[in-house]
Amino acid sequence: MISLGIYAQDENTEFQSNKSQRSSSDYFPKAGDFGIGFEATPFLDYLGNAFNGTSGNSLNLGDNTLYFRYFLTDNSAVRLALQIGSYKSVENEYVLDDAAAMNDPLSQKQIQDRRISNEDSYLVRAGYQVFKGNNRLRGFVGGDLAFGYGRELVEYEYGNSMTNLNPDPTTAWGGMPVGKRYLEQKEGSSIILGVGAFTGAEYYFMPNVSIGVELGLLYGQMISGQGYEKLETMVNSQYVVEDVEVEAGSRGRGFFTGMPSSYGNLYFMIHF
């Protein structure tokens, strides 16, 4: 009877262990599952500031990264990280209307100058990762290839035209060459090529839903193109538009760690 009791107890212990192991593995994505994720840092910053009483707390979603991955097997996946930044600002400034002032020196009539700034940046990382672990917390390692593109362009629009009668019109912005005004300022487009390795861990707090942390090393090379400025000026009473090359193309390389400041590279992932 004692031996039967011990056998039954051992069998029950083994059953509970298998049940626990099965329930843990049920939290993980399986081969053929697709995942989408986003950075957790902005949300954790917001919650942290809310609990410590920071005034003017707001959710800052700028500079966010989207994550996508597809599981080839239960323990391996291909992945894609996409970061898009597109910024445009329009500045309007009042200036004296030169034509009205010529007709009436006491005129206070104003018109507008406008400066339009555009910045675009794109970064794509494609890679492969392998997972290892039998409980809800499991680690991973992998490698990435990276491609990035960026450009900057500033355009100007003026209320007072540059003419033979008004070769030095009133303009809102300074810092321009004598007798000339910018129409465009364009920095050379930049291309980034990189290869890297990464490691990290994920915790599945719900089936197919996890929070993860990742850090890595990236070797990258940046190639910058020709920059130029477009200006308007008067030459011997003739209106002339000049294209001036201001930056020669360049090339640089670097070695970077992929771990931002606040919480590290934390992210949420949802699989289906």
Residue spans of the language-model regions?
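Short glycine/proline- and aromatic-enriched beta-strand/turn motifs that initiate or cap beta-hairpins
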Residues: 9-81, 85-92, 254-272
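Transmembrane beta-barrel strands of outer-membrane/channel proteins
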Residues: 34-44, 80-86, 141-149, 201, ...
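Sec/Tat signal peptide C-region and signal peptidase I cleavage site
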Residues: 4-8
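Gram-negative (and chloroplast) outer-membrane scaffold detector with strong preference
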Residues: 70-181, 188-195, 265-272
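Flexible glycine-rich, low-complexity coil/linker segments exposed to the extracellular/periplasmic environment
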Residues: 31-33, 167-184, 238-258
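Outer-membrane beta-barrel domain signature
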Residues: 25, 52-56, 113-117, 132, ...
